[in-house]
Amino acid sequence: MPLPFTLRQLEYFDAIAREGSLSAAAERCHVTATALALALDELERNLDLKLVVRRKGKGITLTAAGVTVLRQARQVLSGAEAFAAEAQQSATGLTGSFSIGCFPTLTPFFLPAAMERFAREHAELELEFLEAVTSELHEALLGGQIDVAILYGVDVSKQLEFEPIREYRPYVIVGEGHRLAGRGTIALADLGEDPLIQIDMRPSRQNTEYIFASLGLRPAIRHTTTNYELARSLVGRGLGYSLLVQRPAPSVTYDGQRVVNLELSDPLPPTVAGLARPRGAARTAKYAALREFLSAHTAV
């Protein structure tokens, strides 16, 4: 049974959705607006669906069916691109563009090695990266703006597949003058009413709240911040403690203060970081190579 569409028609439809007008999409695709309109008409006719609404002077908007078809079309196009890339692999390994998204608190621990060592090992790859919060990474993956995202295994969309690559044990940092700084290992309850400097980004905030709730504790939150290094600097100044997952190599904050890492004796589950991609998307050679590299070379 012949397919009711061509890849070219899907490419044109994707361009129309991105640009919001036939003329801009035609320029993007290097064809005439007439050719683009004919391709769209044929796609709608073959699918027996109304995909867009055309309003003179107001451009083009997608119908509800168009939104659904667009998401599926982008998955088909992504799979086709992956197929072409696999077929064209050079003897030296991987080629073409590869866009990686990453959650902000994970970025310093994953992306530098990827942008330097992984890129050097696969010199024909054109690496790009996007740093964004979880919801934006989900949208970028489903919209085809990035190929893969590095994020926590919390609140992952059901439209994505998540593959763990590293586990972390939560720990606490305190200033070097803190009364517990010399202990090495503590229970979270030992901090009592000490003020918490909380990382206020989803899912970091939710993970912190879950940890306290699972132990029957309620933190005394003093400050919240979306900036990982600001949290460390506030702790270094003796303004509270922070519950973290990643472990920077230096114990010195941006403003020259020292913080002390304290392990937690509480029976806490590990926090998982991994790779996400659209559900059903091809597991390309690029993806497999990145996964293998990050598993072996990621900073803790």
Model-inferred region functions:
Residues 110, 259-300:
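A late-sequence structural motif
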Residues 95-158:
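Central regulatory/effector-binding core of bacterial HTH transcription factors
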Residues 195-215, 250, 283-293, 300:
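Secondary-structure junction motif
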Residues 44-64:
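A short LG(V/I)-centered, amphipathic sequence patch enriched
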Residues 58, 64, 88-107, 121-125, ...:
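Interdomain hinge and pocket-entrance segments immediately C-terminal to HTH DNA-binding domains
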Residues 14-32:
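Short helix-boundary/capping micro-motifs
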Residues 133-138, 142-146, 151-152, 202-260:
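Hydrophobic hinge/microswitch elements
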Residues 158-168, 183, 190, 229-279:
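Beta-alpha-beta core module
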